[in-house]
């Protein structure tokens, strides 16, 4: 079963994609950047941006009755691998079950943000 997932508690997609899909009980989120869904603002600094990205992932998971403890794989994108340690500090507070993860540095992220997180 394929189910489109959308919540106002996470930022709307900024392109031709969805926030997430649930497929046979598994949730696949699109990458969540640190945009505050209430006002569209982006906080400054990697710690605040990682926090907002995690909150956005959490809002999507909550919308389908799931949570961080059910996530088994994430892909994280950083604009600067120098932010790896600071990003991990925040990430570890949310993803306490330590899902499998890939984390890569990329040249640019949408809206010039410092991080993006997608989860399964």
Describe the function of each predicted region.
Residues 2-120:
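Short, polar/acidic, helix-capping and beta-turn segments at strand->helix junctions
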């Amino acid at each position: 079963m394929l189910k489109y997932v959308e919540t106002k508690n996470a930022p709307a997609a900024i392109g031709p994609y969805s926030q997430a899909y649930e497929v046979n009980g598994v949730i696949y989120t699109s990458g969540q950047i640190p945009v505050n869904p209430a006002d569209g603002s982006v906080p400054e600094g990697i710690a605040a941006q990682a926090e907002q990205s995690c909150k956005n992932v959490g809002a999507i998971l909550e919308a389908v009755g799931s949570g961080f403890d059910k996530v088994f794989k994430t892909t994280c994108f950083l604009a600067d691998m120098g932010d790896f340690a600071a990003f991990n500090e925040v990430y570890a507070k949310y993803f306490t079950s330590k899902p499998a993860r890939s984390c890569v540095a990329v040249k640019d992220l949408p809206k010039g943000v410092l991080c993006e997180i997608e989860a399964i």
